[in-house]
């Protein structure tokens, strides 16, 4: 591909349509303010359509790409020509996507991620689908060759793409977990809030409930049916959204890379080098935990700050499935689930007290406000009931947060778990830790606790170990990265 290549001619259909979509507000304005309202001609309307169509055609005619001397080049533009270059040894990801229109025309888009930010990625929009796959394989093969080839100019040609083996294929039945995700719960709560607006004001006063009978109870029953219908609708929408986003999800692995394919209306294929996977994140929001499910994300290093450093490998699925895939990601040539199943080291009574206090304090403040409103004649029976329910809920939340808190150094991995409503377990390879940060607030210092942060180049850029005793945190850091701490003159403290 040393010569400049043009995109597929079928993009002459896609590009003008895309430009028309971008110019839609202008087109509507021209239609409303044009000759139709004055009984004139169609000149302005035709011009408003012709301009974006011409821009789309010009975009296609002036776009070229090539692969030459270890780099990918993309050239486009007529009046203002731009040339974008990506070195093959800096390619981090190769994504192949195809919208519904692209799939109808047999086209695909190749997006080459370089780690310099989403705006610096190279996007080849309009390749034939087989050509896009060939380019993806060629790029990944050349990337591996550039990374491992000797320095001399007579290096061997890039090896053929290795055989891939399947790791996971989506079971459509897993869509039953979609309503239990955070998005599903929020949607249900929103629909419940909207439905509650239909209640008359008297329904919120316990002393007026007898006045609603008997006709009022029929109204309440109607509202209850509406709330139930809204809940069912939100569950159905969550299931449909799950299937559209993750349809035919397939995760495969070769000796050097992982490949993830998913999507119904828009298919997306993401390829990531194995060396870029720094760890995993097992997300266990409360709803999924109660349903015996979880979600798995992979921590990917080398992505730009504007990109998402956590790639979803497994959408909400049975916990056993999530643990199996996570073990395959962490275990390299042999699956391992020790960082996922081993008991975690607790953080002691001081950390437990902080978890309980942080959960209970807002509830106590709310109850205090409700109590103070008694004298001001602002208290309603429903607000009193709410205040009484908040206290036990806060106590349960604090206990669950305390049980969830823990850490572990297992088989060269840093393991940290925290949270309750959105609990997650983060597993990070020690070789991907590039630094440590110790933070403590005034309240933490009084309890002898710190927040230990492992800095990394992937995901959220850090893995936090919350409210860990200072001695335990330093021992954990020294156990995972002894050389890193030795560089700053730190030695493992004696046991206490």
Predicted regions mapped to residue ranges:
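N-terminal basic, Ser/Thr-rich segments that initiate or prime the first beta/alpha elements at protein or domain
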Residues: 1-496
């Amino acid at each position: 591909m040393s010569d400049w290549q043009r995109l597929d001619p079928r993009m002459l259909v896609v590009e003008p349509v895309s430009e028309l979509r971008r110019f839609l507000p202008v087109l509507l304005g021209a239609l409303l303010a044009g000759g139709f309202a004055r009984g004139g001609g169609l000149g302005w309307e035709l011009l408003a359509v012709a301009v974006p169509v011409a821009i789309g055609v010009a975009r296609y005619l002036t776009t070229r790409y090539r692969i030459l001397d270890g780099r990918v080049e993309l050239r486009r533009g007529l009046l203002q020509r731009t040339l974008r270059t990506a070195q093959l040894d800096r390619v981090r990801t190769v994504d192949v996507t195809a919208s519904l229109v692209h799939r109808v025309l047999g086209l695909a888009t190749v997006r080459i991620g370089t780690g310099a930010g989403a705006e610096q990625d190279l996007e080849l929009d309009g390749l034939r689908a087989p050509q896009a796959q060939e380019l993806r394989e060629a790029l990944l093969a050349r990337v591996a060759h550039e990374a491992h080839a000797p320095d001399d100019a007579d290096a061997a040609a890039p090896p053929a793409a290795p055989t891939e083996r399947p790791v996971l294929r989506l079971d459509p039945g897993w869509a039953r977990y979609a309503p239990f995700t955070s998005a599903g719960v929020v949607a249900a709560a929103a629909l419940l809030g909207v439905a509650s607006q239909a209640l008359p004001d008297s329904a919120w006063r316990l002393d007026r409930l007898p006045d609603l009978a008997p006709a009022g109870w029929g109204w309440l029953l109607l509202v209850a049916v509406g709330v139930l219908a809204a809940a069912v609708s939100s569950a159905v929408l969550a299931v449909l959204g799950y299937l559209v986003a993750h349809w035919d999800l397939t995760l495969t692995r070769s000796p050097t890379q992982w490949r993830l394919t998913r999507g119904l209306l828009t298919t997306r294929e993401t390829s990531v080098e194995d060396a870029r996977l720094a760890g995993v994140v097992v997300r266990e929001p409360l709803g999924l935990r109660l349903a015996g499910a979880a979600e798995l994300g992979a921590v990917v290093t080398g992505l730009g700050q504007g990109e998402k450093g956590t790639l979803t490998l497994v959408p909400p699925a049975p916990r056993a499935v999530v643990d199996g895939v996570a073990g395959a990601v962490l275990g390299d040539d042999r699956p391992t689930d020790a960082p996922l199943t081993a008991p975690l080291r607790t953080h002691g009574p001081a950390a437990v007290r902080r978890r309980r206090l942080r959960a209970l304090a807002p509830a106590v403040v709310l109850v205090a406000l409700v109590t103070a409103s008694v004298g001001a004649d602002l208290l309603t029976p429903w607000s009193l009931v709410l205040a009484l329910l908040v206290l036990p809920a806060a106590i349960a939340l604090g206990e669950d947060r305390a049980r969830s808190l823990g850490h572990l150094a297992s088989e060269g991995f840093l393991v940290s778990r925290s949270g309750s409503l959105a609990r997650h377990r983060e597993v990070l390879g020690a070789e991907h830790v590039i630094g440590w940060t110790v933070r403590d607030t005034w309240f933490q210092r009084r309890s002898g606790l710190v927040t230990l942060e492992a800095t990394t180049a992937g995901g959220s850029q850090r893995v936090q170990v919350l409210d860990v005793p200072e001695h335990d945190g330093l021992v954990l850091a020294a156990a995972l990265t002894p050389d890193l701490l030795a560089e700053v003159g730190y030695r493992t403290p004696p046991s206490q």
